[in-house]
Amino acid sequence: MTEATQTARTLSGKVVSNKMDKSIVVLVERQVKHPLYGKYMKRSTKIHAHDESNQCNIGDTVTIQETRPVSKTKSWALVEVTERAAKV
């Protein structure tokens, strides 16, 4: 028997919340073509992700990867912080 190897999905987005311990909420935007008019529209999804070391801040651009479920709502984990938000 040969097993098919699956590669975990990765997405990138912006952190919109880090108030939970070891958790972040990432806003992932994508473009979808309207079925009738053909115009491209922005659609967004909020994904809860696991941040083991609490290293993310609001506004950071991050890369997340799909993993096994960590809790009821978290099945994604932080891979890296791509870009830090500007400190005000």
Swiss-Prot record:
Keywords: Ribonucleoprotein, Ribosomal protein, RNA-binding, rRNA-binding. GO terms for biological process: translation. Part of the 30S ribosomal subunit. HAMAP family: Ribosomal_uS17_B. CDD domains: Ribosomal_uS17. InterPro entries: NA-bd_OB-fold (IPR012340), Ribosomal_uS17 (IPR000266), Ribosomal_uS17_bact/chlr (IPR019984), Ribosomal_uS17_CS (IPR019979). The keyword NADP does not apply. It comes from the Bacteria. Disulfide bonds: none annotated. This is Small ribosomal subunit protein uS17. One of the primary rRNA binding proteins, it binds specifically to the 5'-end of 16S ribosomal RNA. GO terms for molecular function: rRNA binding; structural constituent of ribosome. Pfam families: Ribosomal_S17 (PF00366). It comes from Marinobacter nauticus (strain ATCC 700491 / DSM 11845 / VT8). PANTHER family: 40S RIBOSOMAL PROTEIN S11 FAMILY MEMBER, SMALL RIBOSOMAL SUBUNIT PROTEIN US17M. Belongs to the universal ribosomal protein uS17 family. GO terms for cellular component: cytosolic small ribosomal subunit.
